[in-house]
C-alpha cells in the first residue's frame, strides 16, 4: 500500500527502545504512523541520504549536485576499540552523524583537510 505523506508530525522512541515511530499526515489529512524496529532503523538511515541525493539529481538533471548540510561543530572521542576514534559532525539545528575512523584514516583525513582546495567551477543557484 502506498501512502503519500503531506507532512511529518512527530517522531518518537518506544519506552523500551525497541522501535521508532514516525508520525505523519497523509495528503487526505489523515494521521498515521510507521513503526520501525531498532534493527531496521540503521538500514533506513543508511538508505535515505542516497535516495535524497538521487532524487535531487533526477529532479534537476545535474549529476554534480550534492545535498550537503552546513557543519556547525565536530568532536573526536576515543572508541572502546583503541585502534579507532569516533568523529561526530553536527549541524546548527542539532543533526548529528558519527563515524568510526581507523588510525590510518585519521592521518589521511587530517592531511587532506590541510591541502588547498582545487579550483572548481562555481555555479549560482
Each predicted region: which residue ranges?
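Positively charged, low-complexity terminal tracts
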Residues: 1-125
Amino acid at each position: 500500500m502506498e501512502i503519500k505523506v503531506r507532512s511529518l508530525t512527530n517522531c518518537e522512541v518506544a519506552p523500551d527502545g525497541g522501535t521508532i515511530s514516525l508520525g505523519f499526515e497523509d495528503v487526505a489529512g489523515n494521521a498515521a504512523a510507521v513503526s520501525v524496529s531498532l534493527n531496521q532503523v540503521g538500514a533506513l538511515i543508511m538508505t535515505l541520504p542516497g535516495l535524497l541525493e538521487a532524487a535531487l539529481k533526477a529532479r534537476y538533471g545535474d549529476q554534480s549536485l550534492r545535498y550537503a548540510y552546513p557543519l556547525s561543530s565536530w568532536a573526536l572521542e576515543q572508541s572502546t576499540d583503541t585502534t579507532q576514534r569516533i568523529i561526530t559532525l553536527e549541524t546548527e539545528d542539532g543533526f548529528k552523524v558519527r563515524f568510526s575512523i581507523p588510525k590510518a584514516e585519521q592521518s589521511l583525513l587530517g592531511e587532506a583537510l590541510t591541502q588547498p582546495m582545487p579550483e572548481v567551477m562555481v555555479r549560482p543557484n
